C-alpha cells in the first residue's frame, strides 16, 4: 500500500506547487497522474522519491515513511524513470547494472548478475547487452531505463513522462510493459502522462491535479464533463469512456443524438 498524506511543497520565494496532496494506492495498480502544465505532477513524483524535499507531509510504503529514509534506502524501494534518457557510450548491460548500486557493499555479487540478467530478459534486451546507448533508438533506450529500474527490485515505480519523446508504437510498448509489471510481478506504478486516451487504455487508477491539489482520484468513473472543463478547459455536455477512449460530446451533437 502506498499512502501519501498531506504532502506540501513550494519553491523558494515562489507559490505553493503541491497543496495538501493525499491519496492511497493499493499494491499492483498503475496510476496515471494527470492535469494541466504546472500543476505539480512531476513535483509530486520527485517529492515521493526525495529528489525534492517536501515542506511537510508523509509518503509511506507499507507503513514505512520514505521521507525519513536515506537516499540509498529509498532506492531499494522506489525506482524513478525520467523523461530524458542519457545519451552515453555506456553499454546496455552496464546501464542496467547501475540499478544494483543501492545494494552493493563489496562489489558485484552473483545475485546482482542474476537480477540484471532477469531484468534484461524481461525487457528482451539480452541480444543488446553489449550495444552502446547512444546507438539505440529512443524507444530502445527507454526500455533500457525500465530494465535498470526493474534491477532495483523496487516496490514502487515512478515514471515522469517517459513516453513524451516516443512515437506511438514505442509509447504503447513502454506502457504495456509497465502494466504487465504491475499485473505479473505485483509492482505498483505511477506515471505522469498527458494523453488521456493512453492513460485510460493502460492505467487503472487516475489522480487529477488542479492548482497543486487533488481534484479527483479513482477509476475511470472520475472523468466527466465537469472534470475536463475544470482541469483542462474542455467544454461539452457528456464524456463517455468507450473502449478506453474518451469521447466528448458537445451540446450541438447531443441535440442531434436525441
Give residue spans per PLM region.
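ABC ATPase nucleotide-binding domains
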Residues: 231-258
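Conserved ABC ATPase "signature" region
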Residues: 110-128, 153
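The feature captures the beta-strand-to-loop junction immediately N-terminal to the Walker
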Residues: 34-36
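Conserved ABC ATPase signature
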Residues: 132-136, 140
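Helix-to-loop junction immediately C-terminal to a conserved catalytic motif
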Residues: 49
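Catalytic Walker B motif of ABC-type/P-loop ATPase nucleotide-binding domains
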Residues: 157-161
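Conserved ABC transporter NBD signature motif
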Residues: 57-65, 74
